[in-house]
């Protein structure tokens, strides 16, 4: 086992920061999220929807906590799940192939939330039950509204009936290294006035008073890659730093929205695909306004559309022309610095590391292959089946996630006994997980979890 010291993560992880960061590699406005630091460790020991040892029971508690996994596999929810704040959920602690949440939407409530290395692949099992009534199929695979101090890192989301992942209206948020892919387009989304199910394969609505988004991959979404929320829905201000992301195979629009907000759109890589309409292939940004809210302010620089030299030389050729001054600005909005890459470098980094990549599942591997080869399509049902396919047939879309042997952890504090002994901790003392001993500010359980990703 690896013996750790306070210098294991390198001085860059703490000496150069005035405040403790969420974990090594956390960047942007959400990097100071505390999550469940200092709270109790809760161990998920089964894949049941509810009950002792279930993910639901751990997620719905309101006390400060760190959630780890002693199992791997897919958790098939029987109802929507709400994750309460003051929590760190360490998907990378699962043995073997990791964790997936399926069948119902997951919503974030409250502040101080850290999510890492999880999969949210909802699907359409319960989406048709309401019939053609307003609100049917209005679910994101993962969503959060008005959450403060939130960071979502290396997660993989897909198969929604509204947006894949929407996060807006909060403050101090980072979305980094996530896969947002394959919303279900012609599924069971219905709103008042519709005559049929809507085509609603959208990526996400993103925004907040301060939000950083970097090294995320959008794939096979017809639009909202993302839609910037702007100062709508009660938001008084919005500042989004959108850098080093990849958008592949949009259909109608890549990025749009942003009413009366402030945006940096820098060094992103856009790759049209088989579903991209020719009229949309040369445009990566379409700002929005309403009668009450004017256009936002956009700093646009260093973005690339694959194969479009005109846009790559001059980004103003890839955005919707807006008459009048003040919409496209010459200097970036002030933000927390990120580790910067140019668009080509970001594309290569995303290929290697995006999503729940400690053990990539077959879905993410396929999406990466499709992006590289210029293939894939907008889908209506998980697995690419036709609309109306019975769930019992389409459930084969969820890959089998196999568990490896769990290491002995007799005190159930989330740290293996051998690791505790090797690092001077007591494998019979549950309380030492929450103590700061092995690092200047990470608790012992955090040091262990961070060591899994070295």
PLM features per residue range, with description:
Residues 227-232, 236-391:
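Extracellular beta-rich repeat passengers
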Residues 1-16:
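Bacterial Sec-dependent N-terminal signal peptides
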Residues 22-67, 432:
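Acidic Gly/Asp/Thr-rich repetitive segments characteristic of extracellular carbohydrate-active
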Residues 41, 52, 64-66, 72-74, ...:
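Detector for repetitive beta-architecture
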Residues 392-454:
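Extracellular calcium-associated, cysteine-rich motifs in secreted modular proteins
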Residues 76-207:
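Right-handed parallel beta-helix
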């Amino acid at each position: 086992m690896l013996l750790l010291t306070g210098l294991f993560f390198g001085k860059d992880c703490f000496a150069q920061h005035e405040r403790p960061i969420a974990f090594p590699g956390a960047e942007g406005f959400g990097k100071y999220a505390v999550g469940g630091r200092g709270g109790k460790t809760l161990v998920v020991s089964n894949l049941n929807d509810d009950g002792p040892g279930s993910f639901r029971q751990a997620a719905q508690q309101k006390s400060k906590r760190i959630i780890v996994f002693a199992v791997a596999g897919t958790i098939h929810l029987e109802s929507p799940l709400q994750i309460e704040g003051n929590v760190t959920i360490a998907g990378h602690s699962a043995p073997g192939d990791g964790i997936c949440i399926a069948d119902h939407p997951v919503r974030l409530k409250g502040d101080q939330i850290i999510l890492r290395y999880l999969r949210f692949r909802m699907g359409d099992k319960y989406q048709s039950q309401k019939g053609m009534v307003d609100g049917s199929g209005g679910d994101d695979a993962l969503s959060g509204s008005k959450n403060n101090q939130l960071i979502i890192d290396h997660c993989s989301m897909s198969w929604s009936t509204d947006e894949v992942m929407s996060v807006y209206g909060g403050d101090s948020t980072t979305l980094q290294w996530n896969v947002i892919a394959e919303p279900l387009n012609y599924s069971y989304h219905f709103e008042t006035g519709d005559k049929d199910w809507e085509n609603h394969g959208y990526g996400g609505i993103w925004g907040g008073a301060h939000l950083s988004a970097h090294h995320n991959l959008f794939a096979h979404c017809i639009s909202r890659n993302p839609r910037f929320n702007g100062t709508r829905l009660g938001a008084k201000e919005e500042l989004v730093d959108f850098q080093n992301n990849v958008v592949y195979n949009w259909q109608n629009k890549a990025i749009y929205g942003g009413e009366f907000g402030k945006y940096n759109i820098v060094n992103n890589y856009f790759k049209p695909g088989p579903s991209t309409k020719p009229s949309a292939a040369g445009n990566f940004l379409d700002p929005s306004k309403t009668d009450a809210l004017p256009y936002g302010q956009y700093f646009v620089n260093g973005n690339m559309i694959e194969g479009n030299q005109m846009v790559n030389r001059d980004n103003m050729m890839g955005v919707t022309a807006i008459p009048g001054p003040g919409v496209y600005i010459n200097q970036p909005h002030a933000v927390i610095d990120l580790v910067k890459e140019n668009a080509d470098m970001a594309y290569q980094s995303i290929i290697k590391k995006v999503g729940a990549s400690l053990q990539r599942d077959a879905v993410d591997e396929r999406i990466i292959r499709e992006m590289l080869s210029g293939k894939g399509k907008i889908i209506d049902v998980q697995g690419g089946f036709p609309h109306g396919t019975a769930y019992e047939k389409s459930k084969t879309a969820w890959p089998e996630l196999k568990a490896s042997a769990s290491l002995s952890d007799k005190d159930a504090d989330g740290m293996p006994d051998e690791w505790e002994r090797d690092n001077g901790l007591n494998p019979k003392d549950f309380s030492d997980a929450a103590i700061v001993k092995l690092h200047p500010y990470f608790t012992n359980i955090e040091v262990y979890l961070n060591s899994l990703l070295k």
